[in-house]
Amino acid sequence: MFSRARPRKLDTEDELYDEALRALMRRAHSVHEMKQKLARRTDNELLVRVVMARLKENGQLDDERYAQQFTRNRTQSRKQGKFRIARDLRARGVADNQINAAIEDAAATTDTVAMVRQRIERKMRACRGEMDERKIASIYGSLLRAGFPSDVIRKELKNLTREEVPETDAE
């Protein structure tokens, strides 16, 4: 019914720059993401480099700031752990040193143990019946995928379920 037409190729620096600004108004982008987005809109690699340099020079594109905002959002809103956040930032092309700095800053204001405990309690409320090994393993896997350290997960599961949680290193 609806066909998604290909966006037309942009030929001038101003058109490409305006497209970049529209994308940045919708959400923040890493340098890598923006470069990919602009490259899809033009065949001129030089034009992409010029627009990228202009965005960086004007302070509209900064991976360090992006990593800080992304990390803060993921820890506060989505309650995700540092491993998941780092993986997602790497997928967005952010450098490891910027990722580590952002995670360290967020760690100063985030209580990982409390976040793990809250997620376990929420999962336990959702589980019907008695907590068996399968349900505990499911919660454990869910928290690992959310990016929390396995030792913190095991400790909190043990505290909240008063059962022995198997020792596995699946970080």
Predicted stretch roles:
Residues 1-171:
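An alpha-helical, amphipathic repeat domain used for nucleic-acid recognition
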